[in-house]
């Protein structure tokens, strides 16, 4: 899109051009490579880091678009700072993300969809784990792009593990990691148990995941779940389940869209390190689901500055 804007700017200058960046490619890359983006923000040179991280082509197009379009915008104050430092161009205006409010069901339809979502989530968990789940279990989730550190997936797993081992849990908890990965196929054993309503009495093989992956041995989520010592045994108060498919209603296991899953949650957690805005916590709040975000997310910073308490 940036290249298109540059082409129009040169060939048809009578047409006004606008470029909105929802992140900077070099900022995302710095954060994803375990470098301290925010602690040393004022010391980074975008061109130098692009060369170091092999991001020169993408960074160059992005930078030229920022400098030469008629109007350059971004979605949050934290990303505006990033643009100024790494692209050498402050946005002309910050336009916070948002969406129309009418995509959330209301009244009886909301209650119906929430009940259906909880029933589906708990049923899949029971088939996978081979044990009963309390109908009133606390269902919590995280979701987003598979950026293990940037999206705080590692922090989410660690937080769930601390809760699991705290010895203070009174209520059963099922934590879902709804992050698309390199899926090979929906699990045939789990799919059969769901479709034929087979009551499983023992956990399925690798009872942490709903779909098989191409790269199971190298998957960071599965490896950290195992490293942390999760067992998903019936005796454990907290279970964790990785849902690595796109939730488009055709995944083969849940067969529900993301929103039709989100509505069944009791809480969501998005502990992002790099999050220019953060649709996920905003969507969660829109659905009436309490959420945790961070003060490094654009939405988190906006909420902290703009609204608080009951006004949120």
Roles of regions detected by a PLM:
Residues 1-312:
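Catalytic cores of nucleotide-sugar-dependent glycosyltransferases that transfer UDP/GDP/TDP-activated
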């Amino acid at each position: 899109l940036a290249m298109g804007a540059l082409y129009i700017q040169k060939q048809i200058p009578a047409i006004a051009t606008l470029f909105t960046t929802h992140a900077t490619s070099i900022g995302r890359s710095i954060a994803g490579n375990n470098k301290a983006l925010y602690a040393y923000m004022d010391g980074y040179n975008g061109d130098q880091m692009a060369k170091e991280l092999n991001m020169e082509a993408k960074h160059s197009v992005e930078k030229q678009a920022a400098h030469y379009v008629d109007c350059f915008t971004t979605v949050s104050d934290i990303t505006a700072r990033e643009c100024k430092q790494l692209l050498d161009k402050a946005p002309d205006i910050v336009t916070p993300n948002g969406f129309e409010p009418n995509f959330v069901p209301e009244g009886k339809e909301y209650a119906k969809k929430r009940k259906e979502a909880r029933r589906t989530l708990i049923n899949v968990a029971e088939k996978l784990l081979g044990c009963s789940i309390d109908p009133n279990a606390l269902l919590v989730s995280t979701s987003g792009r598979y950026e293990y550190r940037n999206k705080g997936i590692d922090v989410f797993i660690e937080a769930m593990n601390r809760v699991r081992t705290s010895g203070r849990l009174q209520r059963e908890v099922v934590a879902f990691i709804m992050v698309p990965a390199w899926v090979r196929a929906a699990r045939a054993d789990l799919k059969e148990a769901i479709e034929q309503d087979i009551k499983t009495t023992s956990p399925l093989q690798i009872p942490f995941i709903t779909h098989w992956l191409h790269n199971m041995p190298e998957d960071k989520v599965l490896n950290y779940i195992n490293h942390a010592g999760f067992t998903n045994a019936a005796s454990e108060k907290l279970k964790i389940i990785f849902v690595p498919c796109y939730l488009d209603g055709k995944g083969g296991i849940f067969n529900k869209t993301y929103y039709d899953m989100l509505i069944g949650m009791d809480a969501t957690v998005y502990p992002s390190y790099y999050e220019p805005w953060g649709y996920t916590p905003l969507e969660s709040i829109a659905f009436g689901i309490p959420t945790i975000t961070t003060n490094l997310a654009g939405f988190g910073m906006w909420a902290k500055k703009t609204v608080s308490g009951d006004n949120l």
